[in-house]
Amino acid sequence: MAHPGTDDGAVRSDLILRQLTAGDARPVLVADFQAFSSAPRLSHLISTRAQGQPVYQVDPLDALSGDRAYVSLADMAAEAAEEFGRSEPADGPAFVIGYCSAAALALHVATLLARSRPAVAVLLRPSWPDTEMITTQFATLVANLRASGRSSPVLDGDPGECVTSMEQVLSADMAALAASQGLEGAEDAFAELLMTYRSWLAFLLACRNDPRSAWSGGGAAVTVLTELPDASVPRLSPSAVKHERLPELDDKNPVAPEVIDLVVAQVTSR
């Protein structure tokens, strides 16, 4: 497995930023992730609709899928912004779309880009992971492995050690499940699943630990798309956030075509 860090400890850019499409129009960065669903990723759906616009995928789980257990949101955002700066001209507007729990990461990236160019953060159904969310997610993953009776993870202290501790619990539960099912020879499959679980929990912990102050001074314009009546963003006044209400859809697909069209309209109509 490739190590996500360089010799000086920086996040490897080839694991945090990937260009999906090329183009001459205003660039779009999409912070999203492929956690436990086989559904198409938002970044790929955007790339097929944002005609003529270069689309980049910012993937926090890739940045956390190697030997390094934990990376802060600020460090991930800095590396993504730096790599993007090497790929695109340093002027002209840029859009950063953040999906769900990746909202804070998108705001970090947009704030960094806004230092040298107009930048807009478009947050689709933003969520702000906290201790309760991580505890619930950890319990769900443990239950998926048919284990029970696990205590809630300790999330304070050194974050790398917190992630490693959760990983050790999940690894033991996976080994027990494999043995009970006669699957001792499926180490590779379980190792991949463990890495997915670990990177997801590490990302949520990075979101929970982030002070959410980097964007408080403004710089990037912020739009929130959600079905909810409230479009609040931590550390920003309501007047600094543009709220676009999403329609209530019967479609259980969270990234239904109607939703994607509304997101794309935000990056093509300005």
Cite the ranges covered by each PLM segment:
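Conserved alpha/beta-hydrolase
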Residues: 48-65
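The conserved beta1-alpha1 loop
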Residues: 29-34, 99
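Alpha/beta hydrolase fold serine-hydrolase catalytic domain that processes acyl esters and thioesters
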Residues: 2-25, 30-31, 39, 111-270
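Short beta-alpha junction loops
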Residues: 61-63, 100, 124-130
